[in-house]
Amino acid sequence: MAYLSNLTLYYKPTCPYCQKVLAYMEEQDIACEMKDVTIPGVVDELVAIGGKNQVPCLIIDGQPMYESDDIIMYLHGLVAAEEIG
């Protein structure tokens, strides 16, 4: 799958829910902009976009999506659409 420029994933390397999303992305060869919230200033950027500092957070065309299962379900839909199309 190609690089998805309309997506940004905010994550924390030690977060098990983030690891779940990252593992799925790697398994499906999904790439997008990645932002590590442990880097100074990145969590403030996340809060400015979504109103909270919860990770993982997938930004889709500027709109936040939280919860690892929801993010994986969304990404699965993209993979399925690519396989069909």
Write out the residue ranges for each language-model feature.
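Local sequence-structure signature of Cys/Sec-based thiol-disulfide redox active-site neighborhoods
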Residues: M1-I30
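Thiol-based oxidoreductase modules, predominantly thioredoxin-like and allied folds used
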Residues: A31-V43
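Thiol/disulfide oxidoreductase modules built on the thioredoxin-like
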Residues: V47-Q54
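A short, hydrophobic beta-strand/beta-hairpin element that forms part of a small beta-sheet core
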Residues: P56-P64
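A short, Lys/Arg-enriched interface patch at domain edges and termini
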Residues: I71, G77-L78
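Cytochrome P450 catalytic domain signature, combining two hallmark sequence patches
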Residues: A81-G85
